[in-house]
Amino acid sequence: VSRLEHSLQSATRAHRNGESEEMVVACLLHDIGDELAPMNHSEYAASILKPYVSEKTHWIVEKHGEFQMYYYAHHLGGDKNRRDKYKDHKYYQDTIDFCEKYDQNSFDPKYESLPLEFFKPIVKKIFSRKPYSSLTKN
């Protein structure tokens, strides 16, 4: 599937699973850096979201690329367990859950995603809210 379809599937799954609007937007945008920053796409996406999402959501998006290695690193000669360096982090399991529920399974050509238009008001709402001051002081 295309990157757009992957993102729509991810956001649709989160929405249908009752996730917060913030998480739905994070799912929609988690791979936005794939084209512009392929070597650090997670950090790129997280930096865009940072002022408008919680610390937890930011961390999940920032680290999801490393956590996704669990599913395909063995095909590239890498360490599928590299995520384990974060096993004591408070968002470790949340990031595993994100990858499992909304990323690695969102490449299904038969999945019926909601259209991009559905998500526009949610994206606008998240990006229109007052930035988190604790995250914008960096």
Name the predicted role of every residue range:
Residues 1-8, 12-20, 51-59, 63-138:
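Divalent metal-dependent phosphate-bond-processing catalytic cores, especially two-metal-ion Mg2+/Mn2+ enzymes
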Residues 13-45, 61-65:
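His-Asp-centered metal-binding catalytic motifs of divalent-metal-dependent phosphohydrolases/nucleases
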